[in-house]
C-alpha cells in the first residue's frame, strides 16, 4: 500500500488501492475452483498447502526480479526550511499540496503514528468492524451450506457446494473492485457506507435462505458489499494522512486486516453451533452500527496528501 501511495496522485489513490485489493480477490476466485486438483498423493489433503508454499517462493522470486526499485515518484526536494521573511509566516504547509510541490520535505526519522490519531482512527475502527463481520461470514458459510443442504453424509458434495458458493462470492467481490469502484468513481466514504449496506442485505438473505440459490445469491451480495468496503476503508485511512506517513498507516491497515481473522471465525462458528441465527444477528448488528456511526465519523482532513 505504501509503495502504491508513493506513486499515485491523491485523486487516483482510491482506484489504485482498489486494484491492489482486487489482486487478493483473484486468488479467492482461482483458489476454490482449483483447490481439489491439488489433492494428490502422497500429500492428500495437505496438497493445497504444499502448493501454496511453492507459489510463495515463486512470488518472492518474481518480486526480486520484476518489481521496480523502491524509488518514490514524489521525492523530497526543496529548501530544508523557508527563508525567514514575512511571506513565509503566512505560507501554507508545504505538505498541504501534493508531494511534487516545491519545498515538500520528508522527515529524516521513521514516522510512528499513534493508533488514536484522530485523522485515521475512525477509518481503522471501521476496518476492524467490517473485517470482523466478513471474517465471521467466511468462517460459517461452509457449515451453513452443509447444514442447509443436508450434506452431512456427503462430504465431497459439501466441499464442492461450499467451494462454488465461495467462488460466486469472490467473483462478486472482483465485480465491485474491478467494475463498480472505477466506473462509479466512488469516494472512500461512499465506498465504505455503500459496501456496508450491501453486506448487511446479503448477510440477512444468506441467513434466511435454505437452498443453494438463496445462499449463493445472499453471499454474492454480501461479498459485493465487502468488495466495496475494503478498498474504501484502505483508501480512507491512506488519504487521511500525509504522504510520508503512508508506510506507518499501511502497517496499521495490515494489522487490522489480520486481526479480524484471529478470533472472529472461531466466535462465529461457536455461535453457529449454539444457535444458527445468532451468527447472522451479530454480523448484521455490527454492520448496522457501522452504517449509522460511519455516516458521522468517517471524514477526511482537507490538508492530507
Q: What spans do the regions from the language model cover?
A:
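Symmetry-related core transmembrane helices of the 12-TM Major Facilitator Superfamily/SLC fold
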Residues: 47-64, 279-295
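Glycine-rich segments within core transmembrane alpha-helices of 12-TM secondary carriers
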Residues: 17-32, 256-264
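Structural signature of the two symmetry-related core transmembrane helices
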Residues: 190-204
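Cytoplasmic helix-loop-helix junction between adjacent transmembrane helices
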Residues: 1-24
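Intracellular juxtamembrane helix-capping segments at the cytosolic ends
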Residues: 1-8, 228-241
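Helix-to-loop junctions at the C-terminal end of transmembrane segments
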Residues: 175-188
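Loop-to-transmembrane helix entry
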Residues: 151-170
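Juxtamembrane intracellular "pre-TM" segments in multi-pass secondary transporters
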Residues: 70-124
Amino acid at each position: 500500500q505504501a509503495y502504491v501511495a508513493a506513486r499515485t496522485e491523491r485523486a487516483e489513490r482510491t482506484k489504485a488501492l482498489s486494484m491492489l485489493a482486487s489482486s487478493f480477490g483473484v486468488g479467492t476466485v482461482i483458489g476454490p475452483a482449483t483447490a481439489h486438483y491439488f489433492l494428490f498423493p502422497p500429500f492428500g489433503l495437505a496438497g493445497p498447502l504444499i502448493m501454496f508454499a511453492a507459489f510463495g517462493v515463486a512470488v518472492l522470486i518474481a518480486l526480486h526480479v520484476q518489481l521496480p526499485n523502491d524509488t518514490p515518484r514524489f521525492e523530497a526536494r526543496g529548501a530544508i526550511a523557508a527563508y525567514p521573511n514575512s511571506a513565509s509566516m503566512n505560507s501554507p504547509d508545504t505538505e498541504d499540496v501534493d508531494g511534487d510541490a516545491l519545498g515538500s520535505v520528508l522527515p529524516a526519522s521513521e514516522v510512528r503514528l499513534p493508533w488514536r490519531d484522530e485523522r485515521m482512527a475512525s477509518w481503522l475502527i471501521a476496518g476492524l468492524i467490517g473485517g470482523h463481520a466478513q471474517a465471521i461470514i467466511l468462517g460459517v458459510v461452509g457449515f451453513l451450506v452443509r447444514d442447509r443442504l443436508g450434506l452431512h453424509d456427503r462430504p465431497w458434495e459439501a466441499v464442492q457446494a461450499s467451494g462454488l458458493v465461495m467462488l460466486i462470492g469472490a467473483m462478486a467481490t472482483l465485480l465491485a473492485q474491478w467494475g463498480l469502484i472505477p466506473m462509479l468513481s466512488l469516494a472512500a466514504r461512499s465506498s465504505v457506507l455503500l459496501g456496508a449496506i450491501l453486506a448487511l442485505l446479503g448477510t440477512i438473505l444468506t441467513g434466511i435462505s435454505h437452498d443453494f440459490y438463496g445462499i449463493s445469491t445472499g453471499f454474492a451480495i454480501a461479498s459485493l458489499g465487502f468488495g466495496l468496503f475494503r478498498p474504501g476503508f484502505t483508501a480512507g485511512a491512506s488519504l487521511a494522512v500525509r504522504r510520508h506517513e503512508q508506510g506507518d498507516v499501511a502497517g496499521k491497515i495490515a494489522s487490522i486486516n489480520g486481526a479480524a481473522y484471529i478470533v472472529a471465525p472461531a466466535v462465529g462458528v461457536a455461535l453457529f453451533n449454539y444457535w444458527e441465527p445468532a451468527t447472522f444477528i451479530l454480523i448484521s448488528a455490527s454492520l448496522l452500527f457501522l452504517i449509522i456511526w460511519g455516516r458521522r465519523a468517517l471524514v477526511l482532513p482537507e490538508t492530507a496528501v
